[in-house]
Amino acid sequence: MARSTFFSFHYSLDCWRASQIKNSWVTQDRKSAGFFNSVEWEEVKKKQDSEIEKWIDGQLVGTSVTVVLIGSSTAGRKWINYEITSSHKKGNGLLGIYVHNQKNSKGLTSSKGKNPFEDWSITRNGQKVLLSSIYPTYDWVNNDGYTNMGTWIEEAAKKAGK
């Protein structure tokens, strides 16, 4: 089943890597959201926070899964955090994919970043549960994301009841 998927990533550092992943995704007859050109993002980020939140919320409409592309500096970023919390509240399936081993436009890899799901928790049965214990993470290179991302997304959607 084709899924409409929102991709969350650190735009200035990981845009090229994200674009490579997106291109592999759409060549497999999939739909993606959360990808936009640099001109669009430059315009959006000039707006007030409430307008940026509204724009992100609009990007999430119609999606069933959110994939957080985890680079060296993804965790803790304001808009990444907003996209994670909004996706969780919306009931989207979530997963993370480490992209540090994916080469950038200069052929370089980067250091592994912190799992952004470690910064968030929910309460279940009176107990604090980290999102990192709920949502899986994978490595794009080491776990063969090109071949397996569709399966990961489908599993996340099913886990979320989508």
What spans do the regions from the language model cover?
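Conserved N-terminal substructure of TIR/SEFIR domains
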Residues: 1-62, 145-162
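Anion (oxyanion) recognition and catalysis
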Residues: 88
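Short, glycine/charged-enriched secondary-structure capping and boundary segments
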Residues: 20-23, 81-84, 109-111
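Short glycine-/acidic-enriched loop or helix-start segments at secondary-structure transitions
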Residues: 17-18, 78-79, 106
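Conserved beta-strand-loop-alpha-helix hinge of the TIR/SEFIR fold
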Residues: 59-85, 93-103
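Conserved nucleotide-binding/hydrolysis micro-motifs of P-loop NTPases
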Residues: 12-14, 101-104
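Conserved beta-strand termini and adjacent loop/short-helix elements that scaffold enzyme active sites
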Residues: 36-38, 97, 132-134
